[in-house]
Structure formats: structure tokens, C-alpha cells
Amino acid sequence: MTKLITTVKEMQHIVKAAKRSGTTIGFIPTMGALHDGHLTMVRESVSTNDITVVSVFVNPLQFGPNEDFDAYPRQIDKDLELVSEVGADIVFHPAVEDMYPGELGIDVKVGPLADVLEGAKRPGHFDGVVTVVNKLFNIVMPDYAYFGKKDAQQLAIVEQMVKDFNHAVEIIGIDIVREADGLAKSSRNVYLTEQERQEAVHLSKSLLLAQALYQDGERQSKVIIDRVTEYLESHISGRIEEVAVYSYPQLVEQHEITGRIFISLAVKFSKARLIDNIIIGAE
């Protein structure tokens, strides 16, 4: 049975005991509203580690002034049931006041990796992500931490944070989990209308078009971006916010493609903003 831990102090006590006995800890940080994408990471951790910890914490620091922190879906009872079914040992669900008992005296600034793509549209977002992940790593002290490749920019930033701050954790990137028709699983999909849900499948189809162009030898980013944009414009009613080609994990905008690349999409429907990506090319 999955145990619910609600305080930092109790979580640290459990972790210290586990470390003394040589127990390996796998960790999946989440903001809740869990779906199959999260559960895939939990299953991976359960198959590899002695203890699997899932955090459910809606982090206020990664919400901007025009983003509604209070409206973010919270369903801790359902989340607890879901992770129990796939074998998680602990759900860590602290209060905001416990994670941030006072005003932070040190601001974390991510730098260039956060100045592009999602970071450019949501200033301060990745500073908040890195702050909370840093704190969670210090509390849970995992041997392995699991992040989805759907948030590929976040994954690149967390990997850089681990390197820069010498965290003794290995980051495991988990492939995007998709619906049968190709739509990337996301907590935001529930906000799509029936028509938008039918259209949303074309995000992944446009990425497959980009991949096909690349495999056919196309190396001009503008050509790929234009073709993907044209495809989306003819298949969806949502507003196309971004179609971009960047190196990965360096996140440098590419004009003439060389090496490994990251093709990123962002589309705003009436009540849901969806992102998707594909990583292709040699390392």
C-alpha cells in the first residue's frame, strides 16, 4: 500500500533510514493530475528501485502573474489511487508552507537554457522549476529521477542543474506517452472540446512530417518550419504559437541543421495550450 507523507521532516526521516540500509530510491516529481505518462515513469522506477517516491506538489514559483495557480487541477485522492495500482511506495504531498516556510533568500536564475521556447513565453517559469526540483532532490535524495521527454526543455535544464550542482542522481528521460491516435498525453487534454480533441492529433502528425523531411535529407530549418506550419494551419483551429528547431540539449536555434535537433510545437486552443516535440538526429 502506498504511504502518504505530508511533511518535509517525515520524508527526510524516511530517506535517512533508507540510505543507511543501502536502499535505492527512484523519484518522480509531479504537480498531480496524473495520467498514463506519469504512470509509465512510476512503473519504470518500480522495476528498477527498492523504493519509489512520487511527489505531488503544485509549485507556486513556476506560475506567472497571468497563470492561475489556484485553478490548477488537484486530485490527491485519485492520484494516490493511481500510483498505488502501479506499485509506488510513497506519495510526498507537502503543503506550500512546509516547502516554502519563508521568503526565499536566494533566487535561482537558470540562464540561457531558459531564455528560449517555453521559457521565453513564461519568464521565471524555469527558475521556479529548478528551485523546487533542487529542494525536492535535497529532501528525497533519489538515486534515479524520472522526467518525461514531452517537456524536453525542462529535461535539458534539469540535466544541466544536476551537472552544475553535483547532485548524486541519475536523470532518466522517458519517451512521450501517447494516445492511440498519437496525441501526447497531458493533464491539459481534458480542457479540449470534442472538435479540438479531433484536431489535436495533427500536432503529432505534423512532427512526423518534419521527421520525414529530415530523413529525406532536408537540413534547412525554415523549410521544415514552413511545411509544418502550413500543415497545422490547414488542420487545426487553434492558434499556432510556435514551430521551432533547436539543437538538443544545448537549445541553440538552428538554421542549417547539424547534429541532434529538437522540433518543438506549441498550439493554443480555447482552454488548453498544448506542446509536443520530437528529438531526431545523431547525438
Curated annotation (Swiss-Prot):
ATP binds at residues 31-38, 148-151, 177, 185-188. (R)-pantoate binds at residues 62, 154. Signal peptide: none annotated. Beta-alanine binds at residue 62. SUPFAM superfamilies: Nucleotidylyl transferase (SSF52374). It catalyses: (R)-pantoate + beta-alanine + ATP = (R)-pantothenate + AMP + diphosphate + H(+). One of its GO terms (molecular function) is ATP binding. Gene3D superfamilies: HUPs, Pantoate-beta-alanine ligase, C-terminal domain. Its main location: cytoplasm. It comes from the Bacteria. The active site is at 38 (proton donor). Pathway: Cofactor biosynthesis; (R)-pantothenate biosynthesis; (R)-pantothenate from (R)-pantoate and beta-alanine: step 1/1. It is found in: Cytoplasm. GO terms for biological process: pantothenate biosynthetic process. Keywords: ATP-binding, Cytoplasm, Ligase, Nucleotide-binding, Pantothenate biosynthesis. One of its GO terms (cellular component) is cytosol. Its EC number is 6.3.2.1. The reaction proceeds by a bi uni uni bi ping pong mechanism. Homodimer. Belongs to the pantothenate synthetase family. NCBIfam families: panC. Catalyzes the condensation of pantoate with beta-alanine in an ATP-dependent reaction via a pantoyl-adenylate intermediate. This is Pantothenate synthetase. It comes from Staphylococcus aureus (strain MSSA476). The gene is panC.
